[in-house]
Structures are given as C-alpha cells and as structure tokens.
C-alpha cells in the first residue's frame, strides 16, 4: 500500500474542507493539504513534493488561468508530478485536453470518497 500526499488546488473553501474531512478516515492518505492561492503552488511543490495534485478546472476566484492551463504549466516545470483534474464540469473536452497535456486522470467532484481513494491508489501504482 502506498501512502499518498495530496495537494488540492480549489477556490472553494467549503469543498476543500469537506474533501479533507471525507478522506481523513482513509489510511492511504498520509497528508492532505489545500491551497487557494496559486502563487503558493511552485513553493509548495518544491518544499512538500506532493504525490498527487488534485486540480479544479474553474479557478476564477484565485487565478486568471483555468486549472488545465495551470496543470500544463506544472507539468512543463515538473514533468514527474502527478496531476489529476477534479471538477464538477464533466465534459469530454476537459477529459481529452487533460490527457493531451499529460494529466493522470479526470475525476468528477460527485465521486464517492472510496472510489477516489481507489483511483488515486492506482495512479500511485503506475
């Protein structure tokens, strides 16, 4: 079993806290952090080295760029970083664009916590 260090990038504090609480009972999660200021992203990646970044698509409250563009920037600077798109907008174009830029998956925000853990564990296994 892999212990997973997760970073959530989302502009909704209530969702971030809810996901943190929902995942807190799972032994697979070593750390769960969230940021709502994208200017902290580079420093966080360098200092904490998250295993997986869960990236919302719609970040209009914290960034002029959407999550796909931020994911693309992250992956160009940190090609080994695992990024998973997490969004309530389950559109095929987001899934295909995510694959094109190298994200490890797309997860709808309506997912059950145990299913999310299963997906993240599979991503960690390669």
Question: Positions of the model-derived regions?
Answer:
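Active-site beta3 strand of CheY-like receiver
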Residues: 48-54, 59
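Two-component/phosphorelay signaling modules centered on CheY-like receiver
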Residues: 13-33
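As written
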Residues: 98-104
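Conserved phosphoryl-transfer motifs of two-component systems
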Residues: 104-106, 122
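C-terminal output helix
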Residues: 93, 111-121
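Acidic di-acidic motifs
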Residues: 10-11, 90
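Short amphipathic alpha-helix used as the core "switch/output" element in two-component signaling
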Residues: 65-79
């Amino acid at each position: 079993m892999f212990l997973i260090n997760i970073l959530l990038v989302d502009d909704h504090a209530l969702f971030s806290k809810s996901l943190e609480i929902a995942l807190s009972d799972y032994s697979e999660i070593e750390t769960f952090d969230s940021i709502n200021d994208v200017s902290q992203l580079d420093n966080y990646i360098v200092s904490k080295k998250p295993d997986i970044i869960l990236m919302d698509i719609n970040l209009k409250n914290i960034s002029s760029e959407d999550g796909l563009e931020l994911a693309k920037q992250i992956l160009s600077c940190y090609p080994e970083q695992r990024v998973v798109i997490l969004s309530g907008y389950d559109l095929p174009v987001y899934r295909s664009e995510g694959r094109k830029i190298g994200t490890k998956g797309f997860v709808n925000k309506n997912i059950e916590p145990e299913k999310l853990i299963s997906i993240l564990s599979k991503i960690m296994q390669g």
